[in-house]
C-alpha cells in the first residue's frame, strides 16, 4: 500500500485513477463517494492507447479530514492520486467531464 495521504479540513479535491482495466466501471468510486455524503462527479476517459482512466471531483459542504485518504478511496487494487483544490472547484468539476459526450469512450459515470 502506498504511503498515507492526509486530508486536513479540505472541502474540494480531485481523485485520479490513472490506470484501470477495461472492465473497471467506476461504480466502486461512486459507492465510496455516496457513503461519504459529498457532491461528486465521476468521469471516464481513454488514454491515447485506448486504456481507460477515471477522475472524480469531490465537494464537501463542510471541511473533510482523513488520516489515510488513499486507503479510503482505494477501489479494489486501484489507488488514486489525490489533488486538493483550494480555489475554483468548478474547474475541477468541468475537468472531470471535459470530453463526455464528445469523444468515444468518454462519459460521466455518476454525478450528485
Predicted regions and their residues:
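Short coil/turn motifs at beta-sheet boundaries
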Residues: 8, 49-51
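Catalytic "initiation/cleavage/transfer" segments centered on a nucleophilic residue
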Residues: 1-36, 61-112
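A generic structural motif
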Residues: 51-60
